């Protein structure tokens, strides 16, 4: 009888080289320390709040006036407590959306909270509230500005950098800067000076990751929470430009030609086939951004569209549990609080996340699997109801595993395959719904070099 584990990564590596010059190139691509820290804190929340909250719109027009911002008070302490209850580690605030209205008292425009009925600096209030309960704070600053008169001229790059400097110097440590690639069809053709923006961030906030239209975190490609079967972090370097030259962002014909065969929405971004055709590679992990409601800004008409804790948990498993980060948008109301339905959903999500690792059966460190290892066995000591398996690669040594199986061992000694997956990356969560077993076996079928797995945990 054929051994069911015979086709392991040591005997053929699924038909791919385990080591060669190309493989060495792939596994030489490593994350920065900022990106490692991101992987260790993969769940955080978006706060869409601003002029659109007051006017009940998703996108403003840029023709609003400060008097249209009729919100007089907010409760940021309620925001951060609700978000921390969900298990999130930080917040990113929309400091300026496309309409151009600023939630801080900027020196460079009158279109801000300083000329509204609101008495205070919202960015400071939220950043202070984050510090009070140990959440990190990030900023969203829309490059597209429908209000600013200099938009479309070189002077706008100066304006944007001035505002970026205000945000990066007045509110303590900034963990992430989120650049949106959205741009209206009728907006002026204009190329943002991205390299200048990046250099400014690296200078003023060297620990900050730059997301989406930036070199550190890529957009997963949709806003519905859908992830690929294989979300690779090692991808062609050209993908780092994909959002900055997209049809909704910049309109540089020369750059667009370079990217005509590669976008954030492509299904395959990091397989060996794709990487083999790419001269330069980079570490560029995916971020899954999705709203707890139908829209991104609060609308009372969407109170019935709040996603349940169960739905949010599925999104968590398919993002954090598949080598991505999870950015969940939670929009406060025009009364300055997070709606009670959203709060309930966040609390439910937090409880479900905490249950993943609440009851450990066994946590092991297989370490580096050598070419003499066919598989790794795990003995539970007695019959247990296995609900979750959590695997982690040492991403400081790159992303290596391309295909693996997990088998569970029944009381009669037989092995049953419980999961057949592709990548692991920074975190892979496998849900098994309480399968009874006395042990388990990990078989790596395909890898780029020797797999390095510092942690695999089994939980009931």
Where are these regions (language model features)?
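Mature catalytic domains of secreted/periplasmic carbohydrate-active enzymes
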Residues: 2-411, 415-433, 443-459
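Short, conserved beta-strand segments of beta-strand-rich sandwich/propeller modules, principally
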Residues: 439-441
């Amino acid at each position: 009888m054929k051994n069911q584990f015979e086709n392991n990564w040591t005997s053929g590596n699924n038909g791919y080289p385990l080591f060669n010059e190309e493989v060495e190139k792939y596994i030489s691509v490593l994350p920065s320390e900022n990106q490692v820290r991101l992987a260790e804190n993969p769940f955080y929340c978006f706060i869409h709040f601003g002029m659109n909250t007051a006017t009940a719109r998703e996108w403003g027009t840029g023709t609003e006036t400060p008097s249209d911002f009729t919100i007089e008070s907010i409760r940021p302490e309620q925001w951060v407590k609700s978000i921390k209850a969900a298990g999130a580690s930080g917040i990113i605030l929309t400091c300026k959306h496309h309409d151009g209205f600023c939630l801080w008292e900027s020196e460079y425009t009158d279109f801000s909270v300083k000329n509204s009925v609101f008495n205070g600096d919202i960015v400071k209030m939220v950043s202070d509230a984050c510090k009070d309960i140990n959440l990190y704070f990030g900023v969203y600053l829309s490059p597209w500005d429908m209000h600013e008169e200099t938009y479309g001229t070189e002077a706008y790059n100066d304006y944007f950098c001035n505002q970026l400097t205000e945000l990066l110097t007045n509110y303590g440590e900034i963990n992430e800067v989120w650049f949106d690639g959205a741009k209206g069809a009728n907006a002026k053709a204009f190329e943002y000076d991205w390299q200048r923006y990046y250099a400014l961030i690296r200078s003023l906030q060297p620990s900050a990751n730059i997301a989406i239209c930036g070199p550190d975190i890529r957009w997963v490609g949709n806003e519905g929470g859908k992830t690929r079967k294989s979300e690779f972090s090692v991808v062609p370097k050209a993908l780092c430009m994909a959002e900055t030259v997209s049809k909704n962002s910049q309109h540089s014909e020369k750059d667009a030609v370079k990217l005509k065969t590669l976008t954030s929405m492509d299904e395959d971004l990091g397989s060996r086939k794709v990487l083999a055709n790419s001269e330069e590679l980079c570490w560029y992990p995916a971020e899954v951004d999705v709203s707890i409601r139908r829209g991104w800004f609060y609308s009372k008409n969407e109170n019935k569209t709040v996603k349940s804790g169960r739905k949010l948990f599925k999104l968590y498993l398919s993002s954090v549990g598949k080598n991505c980060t999870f950015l969940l948008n939670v929009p406060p109301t025009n009364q300055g609080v997070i709606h009670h339905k959203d709060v309930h959903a966040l609390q439910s999500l937090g409880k479900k996340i905490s249950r993943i690792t609440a009851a450990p059966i066994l946590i092991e460190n297989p370490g580096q699997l050598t070419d003499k290892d066919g598989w790794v066995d795990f003995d539970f000591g007695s019959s247990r109801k296995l609900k979750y398996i959590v695997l982690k690669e040492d991403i400081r040594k790159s992303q290596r595993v391309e295909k693996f199986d997990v088998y569970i061992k029944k009381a009669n000694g037989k092995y049953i395959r419980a999961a057949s997956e592709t990548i692991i990356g920074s975190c892979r969560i496998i849900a098994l719904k309480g399968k009874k077993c006395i042990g388990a076996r990990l078989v790596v079928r395909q890898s780029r070099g020797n797999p390095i797995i510092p942690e695999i945990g089994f939980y009931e």
